[in-house]
């Protein structure tokens, strides 16, 4: 697939509207899928840009690192945040099933301990940094 710079510019710009925030201190609940989506989307964008054929987000992250398209810190942070958020999502699904409810992605952080809240807030921060990096890499700030 051949793409041009304007495609990546527009796609990186489109991801800006999905900047995650975590409602851990309010009475609102958070859609955990909306926290994960920008991470997987930006990784897909970089994979497409550099011709990475990985099938999963983790595979793409690893191949981006092996190809020296991302540095070790981005590799480590992306994998950790992807793992933490998906672990939280699957834990929530299991809790729903055990309670006899249909699983969803809406998480109430009032029922979690401070560690879960902390790593979820950290994930949102890392994902926002990744969105900013994509904006810089694909020149969304200059137009």
PLM feature spans:
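Conserved nucleotidyltransferase catalytic core and NTase-mimicking acidic/glycine-rich helix/loop elements
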Residues: 1-143
